Amino acid sequence: MSDQQLDPQALQQEENTLIALRKEKLAAGRAKGQAFPNDFRRDSYCNDLQKQYVDKTKEELAEAAIPVKVAGRIMLNRGSFMVIQDMTGRIQVYVNRKTLAEETLAEVKTWDLGDIIAAEGTLARSGKGDLYVEMTTVRLLTKSLRPLPDKHHGLTDTEQRYRQRYVDLIVNEDVRETFRVRSQVIAHIRSFLMKRDFLEVETPMLQTIPGGAAAKPFETHHNALDMEMFLRIAPELYLKRLVVGGFEKVFEINRNFRNEGVSTRHNPEFTMLEFYQAYADYEDNMDLTEELFRELAQLVLGTTDVPYGDKVFHFGEPFVRLSVFDSILKYNPDLTAADLQDVDKARAIAKKAGAKVLGFEGLGKLQVMIFEELVEHKLKQPHFITQYPFEVSPLARRNDENPSVTDRFELFIGGREIANAYSELNDAEDQAERFQAQVADKDAGDDEAMHYDADFVRALEYGMPPTAGEGIGIDRLVMLLTDSPSIRDVILFPHMRPQA
């Protein structure tokens, strides 16, 4: 009977039997005083050895007799040799019955896949050309009590992979590589900005007033202060306070929290880069963003052509720049400018498109609803969508030529928003009026409308220089660069419902 034909109860019973056997082996080790030693220090990593000695022949290695100390998890056990895995990769270790003590050979026979061992010996090469360690000593460091997934079928259940990411990382090299890339991306972003004189800062995660984005926050209670607080939805207002204070180039890479839906593109807890630079505008940020994205693609992929699913996104070409208004007309030739400029017609179009129209929305809000329903998913190649209506941009500076829109863009790639940026509103009186309008929208039923932040208005009253700011979703960016279909694939421990 195949594994697929076994019912879950039988599989669980088999696993329980294996766990019991492993616990017996651990008990025997404890009795000998040999359980979980912590006095071994390796001097080499598996993949480093593979790279360093790739050109050495069997004869050259035999003559050199290079001593090494390695450690790792047993991933394959063929009796005469084992394959161990560490954080860099894998290497074979040879069980030499001529050089290992009888007691050691007896212990090796009791070891299981998943056990973590330490090996000392010399490097050698097999007749097939594989590099290996000819062991002179080897011992068990950690007994694995749970069996690894079957090597033929692996860990294929998606939900189990997310719930037990530790197992996923052990058995799936491509998953480990995804998170190495994520680390690379964040490190390069940090370096990219610091080379341009940006200062990295940290701002509050717990806030008394959630601001900086249109989103529903998580609420909590501060017992000592006896007050309601919120997990931040964005760091924006604190970062702009720092610009007021004289830190003219700042950035933060950290978590945001939004009490909203979960999907392949959304996780309630996510990582965001936000940066602000004085004496710049949103067009400067477009140029900076293009440069950053090209560097990241080149770093990760070695090319500016980014494959994703059945598409290839071209980061090496200038990103398309198109206004919200013009993009609606471009991708919906049946609509006219007159349709979008009439509030009743725009409301009807938004409703027909499937938008949740509450009835109090102004023309600008309706235009954005139409854009989100009819255009957003069509923006496959990189697009900077600009000139968002001021009604939906309460923190952005109005456009000098058309005050009904703002100097703002959102970057879309693959039909997904990747970044949001604008020339910052630094007119304290205008900001106060927009906060008041947001409060009115919230009172009318808009859960995502912003609160009034009097302290932020006060900060602006001291004077903030002309500034441009931007937020980039790290998770979605990593999805693009690793060709990952779900945001859960690029978050180590995504949120899941508790198991029954």
UniProtKB/Swiss-Prot annotation:
Q: What's noted on cofactor binding? A: Binds 3 Mg(2+) ions per subunit.
Main localization, broad class: cytoplasm
Where is Mg(2+) 1 bound in this sequence? 410, 417
Give the keywords, sorted. Aminoacyl-tRNA synthetase, ATP-binding, Cytoplasm, Ligase, Magnesium, Metal-binding, Nucleotide-binding, Protein biosynthesis
Sequence positions that bind Mg(2+) 2:
417
**Would you name any one GO CC term?**
cytosol
Instruction: Supply the EC number(s).
Output: 6.1.1.6
**Would you kindly state one Gene Ontology biological process term found in this protein's UniProt entry?**
lysyl-tRNA aminoacylation
Q: Which InterPro entries match?
A: Aa-tRNA-synt_II, aa-tRNA-synth_II, aa-tRNA-synth_II/BPL/LPL, Lys-tRNA-ligase_II, Lys-tRNA-ligase_II_N, Lys-tRNA-synth_II_C, NA-bd_OB-fold, NA-bd_OB_tRNA
Q: Which cofactor does it need?
A: Mg(2+)
Listed GO MF terms: ATP binding; lysine-tRNA ligase activity; magnesium ion binding; tRNA binding
Kindly state which reaction or reactions the protein catalyses: tRNA(Lys) + L-lysine + ATP = L-lysyl-tRNA(Lys) + AMP + diphosphate
Q: Where in the cell is it found?
A: Cytoplasm
Q: Which family does it belong to?
A: Belongs to the class-II aminoacyl-tRNA synthetase family.
Its assembly, as annotated, is: Homodimer.
Q: What is this protein called?
A: Lysine--tRNA ligase
